[in-house]
């Protein structure tokens, strides 16, 4: 299915593509929720006769959405979760059908031998004229509450997936997508309740940027712990957001101080723990996060200060940082140097990266909605969440 066909067939997909390109929808959480809602509509509108057809449709829609905004990794992550969901539900349905078939066959074989001997030889020939595969297929469909098909050719193989026939997976898949949406809605709640295990009284915590997950994490711990928070402003892209978050933390009763990025290294020796948010977690355990966060992580490593990252599993992406330039999004340089300075602007190339990359060796712990894990354990979570065949959409 081509990109043009996808956009014309599903108006919701076309609308989300426009929102992604115009940055009307941005940020990992908003993109993840919108992607899940759109995919729920796609599944409800799509007609398919095989699981392969459904998977191809979902992959085509996912590929189109990812190309619309490649730096929004959560879009592709939700697509991969839905593909994994489809495969798991299909395998579970086949397993149930196979068990029912075996039960029917074993019950028919347990009939009395005397009844079998009373059957004339010509009747045996007539009964055995129908292939066993037809009988088993009919039994399976009858058990599933669907009419028996006329011919066994309806159960032919397409790729590695049998035609689902009467197996209606639509409701199960839509229910699974709704579970993903519900999980996204309570991500911060699942993470913030773990704060009591990681934050202690009289500690000095340093954070950078304006992560809502980190803010919820700190505010929850402040209900029973007394600690101080230092917020690095993240000039120039996150300056306003950092000041706004610091104000909210202060209103929650937390001793909060805002510092410039230039003083991070000098103050790091007094910091007990660094807590960061992230835009995405890559396949190698590295982070795509706020610009300037690598400076914080490098300073923390020099002073042997632990770096903790708060993130939902939906930000975990199997993409590897082979090409950092394609991953790091650039922002307008006007925040660094005004366009009014025409003479200097015409003679200089100014880059303003919106995101920064932190290697996995600079991170000590990931706190997710599933619990706390070291970077070396992320591959296990990734294998449990995504299918290896969906790494590239």
Curated annotation (Swiss-Prot):
The modification Phosphoserine is found at residues 106, 108, 112. It is found in: Cytoplasm, Cytosol. Disulfide bonds: none annotated. One of its GO terms (molecular function) is guanyl-nucleotide exchange factor activity. Residues 105-125 are annotated as: Disordered. Acts as a component of the translation initiation factor 2B (eIF2B) complex, which catalyzes the exchange of GDP for GTP on the eukaryotic initiation factor 2 (eIF2) complex gamma subunit. Its guanine nucleotide exchange factor activity is repressed when bound to eIF2 complex phosphorylated on the alpha subunit, thereby limiting the amount of methionyl-initiator methionine tRNA available to the ribosome and consequently global translation is repressed. Its main location: cytoplasm. PANTHER family: TRANSLATION INITIATION FACTOR EIF-2B SUBUNIT BETA. Transmembrane segments: none annotated. Component of the translation initiation factor 2B (eIF2B) complex which is a heterodecamer of two sets of five different subunits: alpha, beta, gamma, delta and epsilon. Subunits alpha, beta and delta comprise a regulatory subcomplex and subunits epsilon and gamma comprise a catalytic subcomplex. Within the complex, the hexameric regulatory complex resides at the center, with the two heterodimeric catalytic subcomplexes bound on opposite sides. This is Translation initiation factor eIF2B subunit beta. GO terms for cellular component: cytosol; eukaryotic translation initiation factor 2B complex. Keywords: Cytoplasm, Initiation factor, Phosphoprotein, Protein biosynthesis, Translation regulation. GO terms for biological process: cytoplasmic translational initiation; regulation of translation; translational initiation. Belongs to the eIF-2B alpha/beta/delta subunits family.
């Amino acid at each position: 299915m081509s990109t043009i066909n996808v956009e014309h067939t599903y108006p919701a997909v076309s609308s989300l593509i426009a929102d992604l390109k115009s940055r009307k929808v941005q940020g990992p959480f908003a993109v993840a929720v919108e992607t899940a809602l759109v995919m729920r509509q796609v599944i409800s509108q799509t007609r398919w006769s095989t699981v392969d057809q459904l998977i191809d449709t979902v992959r085509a829609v996912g590929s189109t959405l990812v190309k619309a905004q490649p730096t929004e990794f959560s879009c592709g992550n939700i697509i991969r979760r839905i593909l994994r969901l489809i495969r798991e539900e299909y395998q579970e349905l086949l397993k149930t059908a196979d068990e029912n078939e075996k039960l029917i066959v074993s019950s028919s074989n347990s009939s009395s031998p005397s009844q079998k001997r009373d059957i004339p030889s010509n009747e045996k020939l007539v009964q055995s004229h129908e292939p066993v595969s037809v009988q088993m297929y009919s039994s399976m469909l009858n058990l599933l509450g669907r009419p028996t098909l006329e011919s066994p050719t309806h159960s032919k193989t397409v790729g590695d997936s049998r035609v689902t026939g009467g197996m209606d997976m639509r409701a199960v898949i839509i229910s699974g997508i709704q579970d993903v949406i519900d999980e996204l809605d309570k991500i911060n709640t699942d993470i913030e309740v773990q704060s009591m295990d990681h934050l202690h009284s009289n500690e000095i915590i340093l954070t950078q940027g304006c992560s809502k997950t980190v803010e919820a994490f700190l505010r929850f711990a402040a209900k029973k712990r007394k600690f101080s928070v230092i917020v690095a402003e993240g000039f120039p892209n996150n300056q306003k957001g950092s000041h706004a978050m610091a104000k909210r933390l202060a209103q929650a009763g937390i001793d909060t101080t805002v510092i410039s990025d230039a003083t991070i290294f000098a103050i790091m020796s007094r910091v007990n723990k660094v807590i960061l948010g992230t835009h995405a977690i890559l396949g190698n355990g590295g982070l795509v996060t706020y610009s300037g966060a690598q400076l914080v992580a490098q300073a923390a490593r020099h002073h042997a200060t632990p770096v903790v990252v708060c993130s939902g599993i939906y930000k975990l992406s199997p993409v590897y940082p082979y090409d950092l330039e394609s991953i790091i999004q650039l922002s307008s340089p006007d925040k660094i140097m005004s366009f009014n300075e025409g003479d200097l602007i015409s003679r200089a190339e100014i880059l303003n990266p919106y995101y920064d990359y932190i290697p996995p060796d600079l991170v000590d712990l990931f706190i997710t909605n599933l619990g706390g894990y070291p970077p070396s354990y992320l591959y296990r979570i990734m294998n449990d969440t995504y299918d290896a065949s969906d790494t590239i959409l």
